[in-house]
């Protein structure tokens, strides 16, 4: 069994699978942009009690598996991340601006799933295999 997270009053193990899509599925995410987006996540996440477990991308979306604390307001974190990463990615990679719609990087919506329905290793493998070339 995996080690549980804990705080003063609880023990927990909360895994989430997040999918964030580029607005109108514009094809702008390459390896350097994904790596920078991941660095931004790793900078912001600790302030919200979030730990990154897996990160991968396809050309128009990213998959993230992370752990969080019960008190974490996930929607606030996700919106803060999307806002900061959008601003920084457009500044650091100005060439993507011409592919975006009205300067908007991320779609306003996102998909957030708990990892309780499938074993974490299955989700981990799924994320690791995202973006692989299909024959």
Question: What are the language-model segments listed below?
Answer:
Residues 1-135:
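Basic nucleic-acid-binding interfaces
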